[in-house]
Amino acid sequence: MKETIILEKVKVGDASAFSLLYDLYWLKVYNFARLYITSSSAISEVVQDVFVKLWESREFLDVTKNFDGFLFMITRNIIFNYSRRYFNELNFKMTVLKGLRIHMI
C-alpha cells in the first residue's frame, strides 16, 4: 500500500493502517534512537512513546509533506525529553549521595 494512502487512513483513525505504519517505520525510529541512547530498554521505550505520540497527533498529519521528517522530529523531541529526565534523575541521585556522605562523616 502506498505511504500516502496509509497516512490518510491513519489520519482518520484506522488502527490497522497505523499497525502497518508501525511495521514500516519502527526499525528506522529504533536505529535513530540508538544513535543517542545506549540502553536497549530505553530505546524501546522511546520507540513506543514516538508511536503513541504519533497516534495522539494523527489529525495533524499532512500527507503532502515529508512524513519521515515529521516522524524524526517527534523522535528527536522524545529523545531530548528522555535525556533531560535521565540527567535530572542522575543529578538528583548524585545530590542525595553527596548528602548521605556528608552525614556519614
Where are these regions (language model features)?
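Acidic, proline/glycine-rich intrinsically disordered inter-domain spacer in sigma factors
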Residues: 98-105
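Conserved RNAP core-binding helix
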Residues: 2, 40-56
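N-terminal module of bacterial RNA polymerase sigma factors
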Residues: 1-28
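Residue-level preference for short helical/loop micro-motifs built around acidic side chains
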Residues: 19, 31, 41-44, 65, ...
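Sigma70-family region 2
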Residues: 11-12, 51-66, 85-86
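Amphipathic, Lys/Arg- and hydrophobic-enriched alpha-helical face
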Residues: 23-40
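Structural recognition of an alpha-helix C-terminal capping motif at a helix-to-coil junction
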Residues: 45-52, 65-77
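Arg/Lys-rich amphipathic alpha helix in sigma70-family domain 2
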Residues: 59-62, 73-92
